[in-house]
């Protein structure tokens, strides 16, 4: 009977091992990172999984930011939400009002993991913090600011100094004309036109985008980006467009491809576009700060962040939340946050990641890689330049795109377009305000 005894023991051991194998907690993570950025997300997840065999982070690309947010909210309503959802910065107010989230600080507390919220760069963490408690609602991940990318080889050909990018919008208009005259198909193009030409233009030049400190002080805010300074700026771009010096190529990041394929000599785009530019550009390029308005009294002020943060969804079990907390803690560790910053161009979200990157000599070896960080820290933010917290902001951005396109096509004047955008946008703000009180 001994063989039977050994067989039974072996069977019991095998079943135990199978049980352990099946005990791995799967943690779905929906994101909007594609191309080189998606590869780095996968790399971080694989490394975490190797170090934490009881958990398995499963990253899934769910489309652009708007698509991912819509998919996440829809999945929550049917009880199929991921554990972690990446949401862009202007979706913050929507997520806060959704009743679909588990605040990050609660997740760490319940998991029994000590987590220092003060490690994050204040300009970044302030965007995603509860204005009442100061605690993080979501964890900063891929934060960015717009920067100016320029083709140094094209600058040389046009007789411009390749080490001196334009500092003001007035300079940029002059440079774009010279670059176009030198044979470039496109002197200047912009990605994310609403975010860069109105949201960040306003902050960088010390102007409010909306009342109530851009919505941080209440849901009864109204839009204010149809003032003379913003109208003048859009009018300048309109004139450049008529001359052929500014090319409108799309609402999102289309200008980055136009830049790295050599069509456009300059573009303003996300600092997170650096990964793809580094990969695909076949020419010498530089990274400069966003231009500012030469007539703005105290410009430049500070850039406001774009990008996204990681939200934890409600309705998961304790083991899932423990795994989520471990993964978020992993992402914030200096070596991992520094790697993400260095490989992608996104901001170092923690002070330690910035210090480590500097100590490693990365900025010396890669001039311009710290441009986005310097913009963000240029001056302490004013109450109305620390970001936007406006309800229905994704839909407001669509309205802004539509109205700016009416300028580029000659259907409306800049004043008419911005007035209409403000009027239409305020209707959405009132709808959101009403929903939060019901």
UniProtKB/Swiss-Prot annotation:
Query: What subunit structure does UniProt give?
Result: The complex is composed of two ATP-binding proteins (UgpC), two transmembrane proteins (UgpA and UgpE) and a solute-binding protein (UgpB).
Q: Does the keyword Signal apply?
A: yes
Cellular location(s): Periplasm
User: Is Signal a UniProt keyword of this protein?
Assistant: yes
Q: State the similarity comment.
A: Belongs to the bacterial solute-binding protein 1 family.
Cystine crosslinks: none
Q: What is this protein called?
A: sn-glycerol-3-phosphate-binding periplasmic protein UgpB
UniProt gene name? ugpB
Q: Which residues bind sn-glycerol 3-phosphate?
A: 65, 89, 144, 270, 307, 346, 397
Q: Which InterPro entries match?
A: Bact_solute-bd_prot1 (IPR050490), SBP (IPR006059), SBP_1_CS (IPR006061)
What GO biological process terms does the UniProt entry carry, in alphabetical order? transmembrane transport
- Superkingdom of the source species: Bacteria
What CDD domains is this protein classified in?
Answer: PBP2_UgpB (cd14748)
Q: Which PANTHER family match?
A: ARABINOSE-BINDING PROTEIN-RELATED (PTHR43649), SN-GLYCEROL-3-PHOSPHATE-BINDING PERIPLASMIC PROTEIN UGPB (PTHR43649:SF31)
Tell me which species this is from. Answer: Shigella dysenteriae serotype 1 (strain Sd197)
């Amino acid at each position: 009977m001994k063989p039977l005894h050994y067989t039974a023991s072996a069977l019991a051991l095998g079943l135990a091992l199978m049980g352990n194998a099946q005990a791995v907690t799967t943690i779905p993570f929906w994101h909007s990172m594609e191309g080189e950025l998606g590869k780095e997300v996968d790399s971080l997840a694989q490394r975490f999984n190797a170090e934490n065999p009881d958990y398995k982070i499963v990253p899934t690309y769910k489309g652009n930011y708007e698509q991912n947010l819509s998919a996440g909210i829809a999945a929550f309503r049917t009880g199929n939400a991921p554990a972690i959802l990446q949401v862009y910065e202007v979706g913050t107010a929507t997520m806060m009002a959704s009743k679909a989230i588990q605040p990050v600080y609660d997740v760490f507390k319940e998991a029994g993991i000590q987590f220092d919220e003060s490690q994050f760069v204040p300009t970044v963490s302030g965007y995603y913090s509860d204005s009442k408690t100061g605690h993080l609602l979501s964890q900063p991940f891929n934060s960015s600011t717009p920067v100016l990318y320029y083709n140094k080889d094209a600058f040389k050909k046009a007789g411009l100094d390749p080490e001196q990018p334009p500092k003001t919008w007035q300079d940029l208009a002059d440079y774009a004309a010279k670059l176009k005259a030198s044979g470039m198909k496109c002197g200047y193009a912009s990605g994310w036109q609403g975010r860069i030409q109105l949201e960040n233009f306003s902050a960088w030049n010390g102007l409010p985008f909306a009342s109530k400190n851009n919505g941080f002080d209440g849901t009864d805010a109204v839009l204010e980006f149809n003032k003379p300074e913003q109208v003048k700026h859009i009018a300048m771009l309109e004139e450049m467009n008529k001359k052929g010096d500014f090319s409108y190529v799309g609402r999102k990041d289309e200008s980055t491809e136009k830049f790295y394929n050599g069509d456009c000599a300059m573009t303003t785009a996300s600092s997170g576009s650096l990964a793809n530019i580094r990969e695909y550009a076949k020419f010498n390029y530089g990274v400069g700060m966003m231009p500012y308005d030469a007539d703005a009294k105290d410009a430049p002020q500070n850039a406001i962040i774009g990008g996204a943060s990681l939200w934890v969804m409600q309705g998961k079990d304790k083991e899932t939340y423990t795994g989520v907390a471990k993964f978020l803690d992993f992402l914030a560790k200096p070596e991992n946050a520094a790697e993400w910053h260095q490989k992608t161009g996104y901001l170092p979200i923690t002070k330690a990641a910035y210090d480590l990157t500097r100590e490693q000599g990365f900025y010396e070896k890669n001039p311009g890689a710290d441009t986005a960080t310097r913009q963000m820290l240029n001056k302490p933010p004013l109450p109305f330049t620390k970001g936007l917290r406006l309800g229905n902001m994704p839909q407001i951005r669509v309205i802004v795109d539509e109205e700016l396109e009416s300028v580029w096509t000659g259907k409306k004047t800049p004043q008419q377009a911005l007035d209409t955008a403000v009027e239409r946008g305020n209707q959405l703000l009132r709808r959101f305000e009403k929903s939060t009180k019901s």
